[in-house]
Amino acid sequence: MTLANNFVTYANLIVTALNSMAARFITIEYVRKNYKKANLYYNSVFWGNLIIVVVLLVPAVLLIVNLQNCINVPSDILWDVKLLFSFVFLGFFLSTGMPNWDCGVYVTNRLDRQYVPTMMTAMLRCVMLFLMLTILTPHVWYVGFASAMVTVIGLVVNWYNTKKLTPELHITLNDRKPMCSRKALRELVGSGLWNSISNVGNMLLSGLDLIICNMILGATSMGVLSLSKILPTYMQQMSSSICSAFAPELVINYAKDDRKKLLHDILRAMKLTSVVMTIPIAGIIVLGDYFFALWVPSQDAHLLQILSILSILGYMFTSGTQILYNVFSTVNKVKQNSIAMVISGVVSVCVTLLIANFTEYGLYAVAGVSTAVNLVRNMSFTLPATARYLGFKWYQFFPQVGTTVLSSLLLVAIGFLIKPILPGGSWLELILSATVIGVIGLVVNIYLVLNAGERRYLFGKVRQKLGR
């Protein structure tokens, strides 16, 4: 399954270049009620994706037909694997070849209409796999089949959302010719390519550490580092999810050219992000040794905790400012950010190689250098650059860094003060201790980070969700 997904990942590199900025361009024109231009982008993306599907369809079919000549597959499961690849590619071609229906919830800032069905289809996928594997004769292609069915359901949900929320967006034929603009495609691909380059920089920052560790320090050290990254990885995923939730609001306010509301919403989003993100930071720093002692009792829990802390230390400064990464795509300045990402990635790799080769701090260097380089880039480029791009003073967002640091330090201090009375000898006790720290951290953050108006906004949102 992983190998099949890897082939789709390679194909997605092409699709990403066209699609990664589509929602931004469509949203701006739609919010400004320039529906004709919004539809021009909407249609151009669709026809561009359709061309990609047609181009990739033949190689995909040839790969599946001649799979045994391309990779080593045991003959007794050859047809299983071919069916698996077929369903994986089917899901890819369906999601790519259909119109950009997921932009409907983005344009109207109704991501909840996508998140809830996504969770439900993920559960449905698990149920389908469980039933197929228990009732029927087990086959590996069931995994691909379940994924393809979930993709179809997701497409239907997205189609309904787009039709309901943005009825002005539709695929159009002018005089039986597709509504498509080469200029729009060049604009979309030009910006999207820089997003792909930014991903290269991100890979240099965090995607090569295990390889470097393996090459210089050996497989054992790589295994230790890999274990230590499990919690930081979840932190990174959590940060990305939170930041993406605020992206539509940012683009909509930018399209309306309402600088006052734009700044108000950004500062509020930064504070809410800080409220949420600093709690797991404190949890990892305080209870990380308990977690690793339970998860991998044969390993050095203290070492794993230190390596994890080195990986997340930057979030103590920037967890509240993570949403500023959305600014680059909002104002279409992705080129500048991509260059900064690649430069910082190259610097990180070079410094890591030097320290790992010529000092005794190799393992700590691999875990911590990228964090330090990331922090320097954020402080020297991301914060001042995003403020200037939005028309504010370069230091506009720096006070939030101080608030985030204060919140992190206070929660960590409280955590260590109560740690002696917190149990951690079993998973149930660890969950209980983490819950205690989480509740205390949430209460402290709500009153430390948020002002009275922001607290009313937060409580109102909670009551609104609970009342549904």
Map each language-model feature to its residues.
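Interhelical loop/hinge segments that connect adjacent transmembrane helices in multipass membrane
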Residues: 140, 144, 158-206, 249, ...
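Transmembrane helical elements of multi-pass membrane transporters/channels
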Residues: 121, 146-165, 179-252, 271-272, ...
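Interfacial/gating helices of multi-pass transporter permease domains
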Residues: 1-12, 41, 140-145, 183-191, ...
